[in-house]
A protein has these predicted regions:
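FIC/Doc superfamily catalytic core
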Residues: 1-216
Length: 216
């Protein structure tokens, strides 16, 4: 079983593979600068929160349609208990994303995101918004907001690292990616950090949502 930082390296694609990826990152950054300073950027941010909630929960098997999300935002929840739970998760995701944007703003905030404390904070920010009846996995196991998993897990064919090694793995993850904060390399590091955090699988539930919530 994985239990040491060197076992989840390399943390970036091989140099020979980076050229094409950096070119794509350059094109993305150039397109994004066209929105900088425009009022539309703020409007898009609000729209994207709803879109992000829709897609991340669909990926996680907690699908809600856009109309159902709009109804939940108006506190008009379904009489169906399962759908109502999905609606609560959808609006919790939207509200958590807004809070995270404020808390981790600016250059210093972007660096702070690459830390074990921030990873736990994001999990807590999302799941603390849910009522106790929603804080249970499909297997009936309790979900504690912000708590790293306390047992071993396997997701499909992937056996996640030993739970006792999570602090040291997250420390290495943060040290490495937090130092890459400039230009196209930062975008490449963002994608790699997303994948590696999923490999670590720090929580008993909600890992995908936590990985996708910060987009810095």
């Amino acid at each position: 079983m994985y239990d040491a930082p060197h076992q989840f390296e390399p943390l970036l694609p091989a140099p020979a593979q980076q050229e094409a990826l950096l070119a794509k990152a350059h094109d993305l950054a150039r397109s994004a600068t066209q929105l900088a300073g425009l009022p539309v950027a703020g409007e898009l941010r609000g729209l994207l929160r709803g879109m992000n909630s829709y897609y991340t929960n669909r990926i996680e098997g907690q699908h809600t349609r856009p109309l159902e999300i709009e109804q939940a935002l108006a506190r008009n929840f379904s009489a169906n208990k399962e759908l109502a739970a999905r609606q609560r998760l959808a609006i919790a995701h939207i509200d958590a994303e807004a809070a995270i944007e404020l808390r981790y703003s600016g250059e210093s905030g972007g660096r702070q995101l690459y830390a074990a404390a921030a990873v736990r904070d994001i999990h807590r920010e999302l799941f603390s918004r849910l009522p106790p009846e929603d804080l249970v996995t499909s297997e009936g196991e309790p979900v504690v907001p912000g708590e790293l998993r306390q047992r071993e897990v396997q997701v499909g064919r992937h056996v996640a690292p030993a739970h006792a090694s999570l602090p040291v793995l997250l420390e290495r993850w943060g040290q490495f990616y937090g130092d890459i904060r400039r230009g196209e390399a930062a975008l490449l590091a963002l994608a790699a950090a997303h994948q590696r955090l999923g490999w670590v699988h720090p929580f008993i539930d909600g890992n995908g949502c936590v990985m996708r919530l910060p987009k810095r």
